[in-house]
UniProtKB/Swiss-Prot annotation:
Function: Catalyzes the formation of phosphatidylethanolamine (PtdEtn) from phosphatidylserine (PtdSer).
Subcellular location, principal: membrane
A biological-process GO annotation: phosphatidylethanolamine biosynthetic process
Primary gene name: psd
Cellular compartment(s): Cell membrane
Protein name listed in UniProt: Phosphatidylserine decarboxylase proenzyme
Record carries keyword Metal-binding: no
Pathway: Phospholipid metabolism; phosphatidylethanolamine biosynthesis; phosphatidylethanolamine from CDP-diacylglycerol: step 2/2
E.C. number(s) listed in UniProt: 4.1.1.65
Organism of origin: Anaeromyxobacter sp. (strain K)
Any one Gene Ontology cellular component term annotated for this protein: plasma membrane
Catalytic residue positions: 89, 145, 249
Modified residues (Pyruvic acid (Ser)): 249
Site entry: Cleavage (non-hydrolytic): 248-249
Catalytic activity, reaction form: a 1,2-diacyl-sn-glycero-3-phospho-L-serine + H(+) = a 1,2-diacyl-sn-glycero-3-phosphoethanolamine + CO2
C-alpha cells in the first residue's frame, strides 16, 4: 500500500475514539496467562530486548509493560551541564533551525512553531533556534527524560487529532505534528529556554508527566487547550524522567537561538538512546 492510499484509508477511521478504546484495553488487568502471552508476542513482533527491563510478571497491565522502566545503569547520561542528552530512545526524523517561524517535517513539508507549541509568544523565543525531531518506534523504550538540568517553568496542552507518526504519515500528512495532540514542557536550562514536545499518535492514548501528577492525561474527549506557568518553577536534573507515552510517538526539542548547537551527524534515520549527547553550547 502506497503512502497516500494508506493515509486515505486512515482518514476514514475515528482515530481519537480508536485510541481511547485501545488505551482502555491496555489498562485492563487481564488474567496473568493472557497478559504474559500478549507481552511476549508483542516483544517478538517488534524485536524488544527484554533483558533491558524487569521480568514480565511485574506488569499488571499491557500498558505498564509498554511504559516499562529500564534496569538501572543501562542508559548513562552524558556529563556536562551544557551538553544536551537525548531524552528518548528513537531515530532522528529531522534536525535544523526554526526559520521564518517554521520547522521542517519532511522533504517539501514544513509547519509553524506557533501551531506546534500552541503559544505564539513562546514560539517567538525559539525563532532561529535549533530543533530536533525524534521518532519512537513500537520497539523502543517509551519513557522521556530531561535533556538538560534546570527548572520546569510551565506546560502547554494542545488537543488535536491522533494520526500515526510513522514515516509514511510524516511524508504525507502536512503539519502532522501541529495537528496531533501534544504536551509541551517548558524548561529554563544552562542553554536558555528549551521546549520538550511530546506528540501523541494513533493508539497513543495517553501521555503522562512525572514532574507534576496534577497534569491531566491527554486524549480526553472534549478536551480544551490548557496552559500553566509555575509561580515556583520545578527543579529537575538532566536524565531525570520527565514522563512517558502509553504507546509510542515523537518528541521534538526546541532551543533558543544562539544557545544550542546540535551534532551535524544527527541525520534522518540515525538511532539515538537516552543519555547520548545530541549537542551542546553554540
Amino acid at each position: 500500500m502506497n503512502d497516500r492510499l494508506f493515509i486515505s484509508a486512515l482518514r476514514l477511521l475515528p482515530k481519537n475514539a480508536l485510541s481511547r478504546a485501545v488505551g482502555a484495553l491496555t489498562r485492563w488487568r487481564a488474567p496473568v496467562p493472557v497478559r504474559l502471552a500478549a507481552m511476549r508476542a508483542f516483544a517478538r513482533r517488534y524485536g524488544i530486548d527484554l533483558s533491558e527491563c524487569p521480568d514480565l510478571d511485574v506488569y499488571r497491565t499491557f500498558g505498564e509493560f509498554f511504559a516499562r522502566p529500564l534496569r538501572p545503569g543501562l542508559r548513562p547520561i552524558a556529563p556536562g551541564e551544557r551538553v544536551v542528552a537525548s531524552p528518548v530512545d528513537g531515530a532522528v526524523s529531522e534536525t535544523g533551525r526554526v526559520e521564518a517561524g517554521r520547522l521542517v517535517q519532511a522533504k517539501g513539508i514544513d509547519y509553524p512553531a506557533a501551531a506546534l507549541l500552541g503559544d505564539e509568544a513562546l514560539a517567538a523565543r525559539f525563532a532561529g533556534g535549533a530543533y530536533a525531531t525524534l521518532y519512537l518506534a513500537p520497539k523502543d523504550y517509551h519513557r522521556i527524560h530531561f535533556p538538560l538540568g534546570g527548572k520546569v517553568t510551565g506546560w502547554r496542552y494542545v488537543p488535536g487529532k491522533l494520526w500515526p507518526v510513522n514515516p509514511a504519515s510524516v511524508r504525507t500528512v502536512r503539519g502532522l505534528f501541529a495537528l496531533n495532540e501534544r504536551l509541551v514542557t517548558v524548561l529554563e536550562t544552562p542553554l536558555g529556554a528549551c521546549a520538550v514536545v511530546a506528540v501523541g499518535a494513533t493508539v497513543v492514548g495517553r501521555v503522562c508527566a512525572y514532574y507534576d501528577p496534577s497534569i491531566p492525561f491527554t486524549n480526553l474527549p472534549g478536551a480544551a487547550p490548557r496552559r500553566h506557568d509555575y509561580e515556583t518553577p520545578i527543579p529537575v536534573e538532566k536524565g531525570q524522567e520527565l514522563g512517558a507515552f502509553e504507546m509510542g510517538s515523537t518528541v521534538i526539542l526546541l532551543f533558543e537561538p544562539g544557545k544550542a548547537r546540535l551534532d551535524p551527524r544527527l541525520a534522518p534515520g540515525v538511532r539515538v538512546r537516552v543519555g547520548e549527547p545530541l549537542g551542546g553550547a553554540a
